[in-house]
Amino acid sequence: MSLLERLNQDMKLYMKNREKDKLTVVRMVKASLQNEAIKLKKDSLTEDEELTVLSRELKQRKDSLQEFSNANRLDLVDKVQKELDILEVYLPEQLSEEELRTIVNETIAEVGASSKADMGKVMGAIMPKVKGKADGSLINKLVSSQLS
């Protein structure tokens, strides 16, 4: 089942159960997916493209969460945290830090990286492997710790 089909199914369920918050988030994600399809001039998106849109939505929410907590807006922090929890249901299972560390070490060996100057090469090689399954900032932190 594609992400769009799953969103449609959940949207119906949330309408029936009158779960307004979840319904709003699902509608926003669905709109983002449709906008991306229009932008790419396609009828439907590939699974990879859907994952990219979902990751972008998550990243926006995480950035907002950080900004709201810095501004001490607890009401908005709660709202955005709930949205994040709803969105994370649609992501594929995330890799553990140990699995990521293994992938990082393998990729560093493949690329032959030895210093922080090679970080771009490593990140470029590793991101397609873990797309949607890991947070980019965590990968960045692991790579930089291995290269230092």
UniProtKB/Swiss-Prot annotation:
Source superkingdom: Bacteria
Signal peptide: none
GO MF annotation terms: carbon-nitrogen ligase activity, with glutamine as amido-N-donor
Coiled coil segments of this chain: none
InterPro entries: Asn/Gln_tRNA_amidoTrase-B-like (IPR003789), GatB_Yqey_C_2 (IPR023168), YqeY/Aim41 (IPR019004), YqeY/Aim41_N (IPR042184)
Alphabetized Pfam families for the sequence: YqeY
Listed name of the protein: Uncharacterized protein YqeY
